[in-house]
Amino acid sequence: MGGWVSLSPTEKGNMITYSDTTTSEAIFYQPIDFIGYSHVQGLYPHESENWNENTYLYFLSLFKKTASGRFDYATKFTRYIAMDMEVTMPVNDNDEIDYAFMETYISAIKKLTIARLIEFIKCEKEAYRIAINN
């Protein structure tokens, strides 16, 4: 994100974006509507009913891992390269993309992260309390 403006969004949120003029580090999940510039590319799924924030975040990690280290400012990460990249997805017993697994996995990571953050805040408060009382 480059900042906040009062202009109306040009692109719908709930999608993965990347820049076709930089490295693979500029791959992001955009949860809300945004203003897209000419070099911001979007990844659009063939079937969209099963994609949500958690499944996109799971795919994002796979997509970034697949692209990582292959590009720099001389070797651009273009839309044509992105279209040809093969990303290995989790599949269920029917050999279909396992959206339920991706949803559950990312949901669990979010819950663990929140629990760790709460524990960190508690420890930090206790450290402040001890420092103030000494």
Features from the language model and the residues they span:
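DNA target-recognition domains and sequence-specific DNA-contacting regions of bacterial/archaeal
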Residues: 1-86
